[in-house]
Amino acid sequence: MTYCIGIKTNEGLVFASDSRTNAGLDNVNIYSKMFTHDVGDRTIVMVTSGNLGTSQAVYKSVEKDLKSSSGILNLNTCKDFEQIASYVGSLNIKHSSPQGINTDNVLLGSTFIIGGQIKGQKPELYLIYPQGNYIRPADSKPYLVIGEVKYGKPILDRVIKPDVSIGDASRCALISMDSTLKSDLTVGPPIDFAIYKKDENKLASLKCLSLDDEDYSKVCLSLIHISEPTRPTPI
């Protein structure tokens, strides 16, 4: 299993993904589930959950298309993020079910969160399903989660609004990830973490965080402090 987060605020975007893959108790490995493309007039971040083979095949196809000189559609030639979402969705179908959309898409497909900004356009965030279709998050809840979502979602519901600061959104993403790490052994570190600030056309931060990383530890320690019960006020 896995857990990935994408948050969109008025100030920018935040992404987080764990790195654990689990094919049984005796087959646990670490693979990055984040892909970044920060070139020219566009910044793009993708995170994924689902079938590892399909996810890796999609990422490899994206990289291959970027290197191609034949003028085929790729992340650099897409005109907007909706076309990018459609492009990644078509690759998802291609690698999970070459014969077309069927039940194999559910068994072998992957789910992606993709977001970023093309210069001159607004920042965007999309969820791409195994069947290749896609959606944007609701304006009232501008975030997307995939994978093992039940442990980390409550804090996002409480905190994430369009006007939340990029700093608070980042802290909230780490708290959400930490809640999931502590509750589900199929989700594990290191954590790939990316921050994009609106109209900067480059990633403000891209880190691979371990549990003893200073930035991550500060957030977790603040949680412990907040969770300490307050003593009743004497009458």
Each predicted region: which residue ranges?
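Short beta-strand scaffold segments in enzyme catalytic cores
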Residues: 2-8, 13-15, 110-117, 124-126, ...
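Glycine/small-residue-rich interface belts in oligomeric ring/scaffold proteins
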Residues: 16-66, 70
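Conserved mixed alpha/beta catalytic, RNA-binding, or beta-rich assembly cores of soluble enzyme
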Residues: 124-161, 167, 172
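Terminal amphipathic helices with adjacent charged low-complexity linkers/tails
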Residues: 200-203, 210-211
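Single conserved hydrophobic/aromatic residue that forms the stacking wall/gate
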Residues: 224-235
